[in-house]
Regions:
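Substrate-binding cleft and catalytic face of glycoside hydrolase catalytic domains
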Residues: 2-152, 170-184, 393-407
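A solvent-exposed, charged loop/short amphipathic helix patch at secondary-structure junctions
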Residues: 3-29, 74-108, 226-282, 328-365, ...
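Second-shell loop/turn segments in exported
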Residues: 27-30, 109, 150, 353-354, ...
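Well-ordered, non-membrane alpha-helical segments in soluble/globular domains
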Residues: 28-39, 112-121, 154-165, 192-198, ...
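Acidic, His- and aromatic-enriched active-site or binding-groove loops in soluble protein domains
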Residues: 72-98, 156-166, 170, 203-214, ...
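Aromatic-rich peripheral "rim/lid" segments of glycoside hydrolase catalytic domains that contact
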Residues: 84, 88, 329-430
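Noncatalytic carbohydrate-binding groove/subsite architecture in carbohydrate-active enzymes
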Residues: 96-134, 139-337
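C-terminal extracytoplasmic interaction modules
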Residues: 416-618
């Protein structure tokens, strides 16, 4: 029997209430939580000793076939769009747009009362629950915040300034307030050569305690194959130094892509500012310069003589959302998510769209590594205690995402931003360090897919025995380097081209080669493991190649989810299939810097690159 629930009176009767739209036979969204449940959640979190930030969130319940006028010129409004699409109608840049006029301001004014009512209601709820540590007065309203009224005014920003004052009068001085700006929004908007620091009146408001940024800037430009620029920076796209370095480097800082064609060809245009020598105003990744400099608007491209109201360094920055989808190459576009019902459905640049929980973890680790290092940022800039990881779901795992007949968005979990069910997993380097420490050993390991839920160690053994099991799973070669063991990612990094005249002359042939029998190459592999999503029951995952060949069965004492198990099985099958072709050659003493795991190519051997698996001296 269900427990009795409290009855609440609302301002809308059941008859008058608007029903959430349907999709695929069920509700498109969950309902808005009741006031009682919000108060109870706040009280429960506070009782656990946690600080609470309340975050009113706008979802767009606009189904397909809505027939609504599309401000962007389409036949109707896009299905279930991002709230950042809300704008004036027609939208800026469209024929007949009221952008830059009093008519645009009037449209914004018509929207604001309903929005204010929602935010003020949650402010009152927070007080009724005994108060909260922080509150956001909105997030990612990019399309509205950038709408210009007459005289280059920004009416929605003005409304946010007023709203912040009204929320402050409700919650009092103890609750911190901010607005969570989109990463493309926080530092201003640029139109037709003009630049406006349009949110500065809000950031400068005495009622706003911090600059909020939903920080989904690209941290990678990774591609498959051998011919891409970032392979010179890292062996794999999972490396923390590569990802953390790209927080203030690369796309959006040093350069940009002027077109989709340029992106495909990796033709990068440098970010410059030839007139005033302020390239940082065009760099959305240059958080430090934005925070530490005065801001001068450039209406019509002409720099104002006087700065905006922003006082450099006056308030900390909160990263109100960080993370990325658990999807192949998620770091290329951390803001992208998969949702088949939504017009926003997509996959990151150059992604296969397959699940990859490891890149999600690595993006979070990179942010924490970067922003918790005091040597890399001015004091007081980014508050390392305000890195909000997106997102943890209150629905119970694994019932969510498994019961898709109850929660239709469960199918999105595999590649989505959810941390639920994944936060306890480890990258291979983390697990390797933990295992080695049990044996008082030192290991240097790189992060390699998949994300691992755990590894069973049974019976007596050495650190090498345990680590070899782990590295077999993740495709790393275990080597010795001084007093440490080293895990070197196989099949990764740039290959060095060797010329035949660089090979050593010995009594044996300069180069010998053995080709494997194609009929012996495995075409199928099954991987036995423990299934994290099914209460750690024994499970198998399969990988199949289109060729004809034998079946390989491999069992490993590891805990994986279904996506990680498929990743591992496919990599193991590729490794078995590639292992038949071998070459052997000798190098002079000047080439002794090679290690197992390094890759080389040789002229006229198109099957390369070849990976060094063994080195013999003498």
């Amino acid at each position: 029997m269900r427990p009795a629930t409290s009855k609440e009176r609302t301002g809308v009767t059941r008859v008058a209430a608007r029903v959430v739209s349907s999709h695929a036979g069920g509700p498109a969204y969950g309902g808005t939580p009741s006031d009682a449940s919000v108060r109870a959640a706040i009280a429960d979190l506070k009782a656990r000793g946690l600080k609470v930030t309340i975050y009113p969130f706008v979802l767009m319940d606009i189904p397909q076939g809505n027939g609504l006028v599309d401000p962007y010129g389409g036949s109707e409004q896009s299905a279930y769009p991002w709230r950042g699409r809300i704008t004036c109608s027609p939208a800026p840049g469209q024929p007949g747009s009221p952008e830059g006029s009093g008519a645009a301001a009037a449209q914004v004014a018509a929207f604001v009362p309903g929005y204010r009512a929602m935010v003020l209601h949650y402010a009152q709820l927070a007080v009724a629950a005994g108060g909260v540590d922080a509150m956001l007065i909105g997030s990612e309203m990019v399309g509205l915040s950038s709408v210009r009224g007459a005289g280059n005014s920004f009416p929605f920003v003005d409304a946010l300034v007023t709203l912040a004052a009204d929320v402050r009068s409700i919650v009092g001085p103890a609750t911190k307030l901010t607005y969570a700006a989109d990463w493309s929004e926080y530092s201003g908007c640029q139109k037709d050569g003009a630049k406006f620091f349009h949110l500065d009146p809000l950031w400068a408001s005495p009622n706003i305690d911090a600059i909020g940024i939903d920080c989904y800037m690209p941290l990678a430009d990774w591609r498959d194959g051998e011919a891409h620029a970032d392979l010179a920076l890292a062996r794999t796209g999972y490396e923390l130094d590569y990802l953390a370095g790209n927080i203030e480097r690369g796309e959006g800082y040093d350069w940009f892509y002027a077109s989709d064609a340029d992106r495909r060809a990796q033709l990068r245009t440098q970010i410059t500012d030839g007139v005033h020598g302020e390239p940082w105003i065009w760099r959305y990744k240059d958080i430090e310069a934005f925070w530490g400099q005065q801001h001068f608007d450039r209406p019509g491209g002409v720099r104002n003589a006087f700065p905006t109201a922003w006082v450099p360094g006056s308030k900390p920055i909160w990263l109100t959302e960080i993370g990325c989808g658990a999807v192949d190459k998620g770091a290329n576009q951390p803001n992208i998510f998969g949702d088949s019902k939504s017009a926003e459905d997509g996959r990151p640049y150059f992604s296969a769209g397959t699940p990859d929980a490891l890149i999600q973890r690595q993006v979070l680790r990179a942010h924490h590594q970067r922003w918790n290092d005091p040597a890399l940022s001015p004091a007081g800039m980014v508050d390392p205690e305000r890195l909000y990881c997106w997102t943890w779901d209150a629905r119970p795992f694994p019932v969510f995402p498994a019961l898709t007949e109850v929660w239709s968005d469960g199918t999105n979990h595999a590649t989505g931003h959810w941390l639920t069910g994944r936060l306890g997993g480890l990258a291979s380097d983390e697990l390797a360090h933990a295992l080695a420490s049990e044996f008082d050993s030192l290991v240097l390991a790189a992060p390699s897919a998949p994300l691992i839920g755990g590894l069973t160690v049974s019976g007596a053994g050495t650190a090498r025995d345990v680590l070899e099991t782990l590295f077999d799973l993740t495709g790393q070669k275990l080597a010795a380097r001084g007093d440490a063991m080293v895990g070197i990612a196989q099949g990764a990094g740039q290959a060095l081209e060797l010329e035949y005249d660089a090979l050593a002359s010995t009594d044996a042939p300069v180069l010998s080669r053995r080709r494997g029998d194609g009929a012996e190459r495995p075409a199928r592999l099954t991987l036995g493991h423990f299934d994290r999503e099914r209460d750690y029951l024994a499970a198998t995952s399969a990988a199949i190649r289109p060729d004809q060949g034998p079946l390989v069965t491999q069992n490993m004492p590891v805990v994986l989810d279904s996506g990680a198990a498929r990743q591992a099985a496919e990599r193991l099958l590729d490794q078995h299939a590639a292992g038949g072709d071998r070459i052997e050659f000798a190098l002079p003493p000047g080439q002794i810097g090679f290690e197992p795991g390094d890759r080389v190519t040789l002229p006229d051997l198109a099957e390369g690159p070849f990976e060094i698996t063994e080195i013999r001296d003498g």
